[in-house]
């Protein structure tokens, strides 16, 4: 199977077309996702749910349901890539949360306290997901004979690296400096949900700060509290539940919480994945993903 790839040469002001042979299967797609993060092992929140081969066109989205699978079929896609866990990965999602422990210990939180905070988070999410009906999307894909992959933590890790570089490249004296650096990233710039300081004040000194993403989900109240009580002044989350935020306000913790925005962050990871697939000659249909330019 052949795909046409456009290579731009701005200095000569023309486009060069070249034919590239495409022979990609779902295992190769997963490998590209892992390479994106610099990893070799597939985490518990990512999987090849339905295998496929000879893939030259894929639909990529953050949340995939039956409607997106039908759209992919209508658009003659050969496979679908979801970001958020589906099927068994939605049940096993909590198993990647231990990365929070590594983050906290790295930033001075005693391991025992870090583990206790993460266990509370794992219990809450595991209990919630145990009640979910998790087989519908994979079942629909089987009925449609549509290869299906979901890649969650590896894309989030790529997103973490992009954001970390952006923060370190700018000023970090004040919380507002961090907000400005993140807001310049194209996906956050295009988002309707702007980067905000949900707790604390943007005029505060940032002090010791930490970016807490690519550990499955946000750390909520208990993990933020552990950071604040052990020398971290500014915590950066992708998102936070309202109830967890209220707990922080009621306990009157001292610190700052920057919330970046879920769609903007996830779009960074999926754009990175889509760009690399296109480099292999795969056509991508990006659904609901914010632009990276």
Q: At which residue positions do the language-model features occur?
A:
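N-terminal amphipathic/basic-hydrophobic helices that include classical n-h-c signal peptides
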Residues: 1-21
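Active-site catalytic microenvironments in core metabolic enzymes, especially phosphate/sugar-handling
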Residues: 16-293
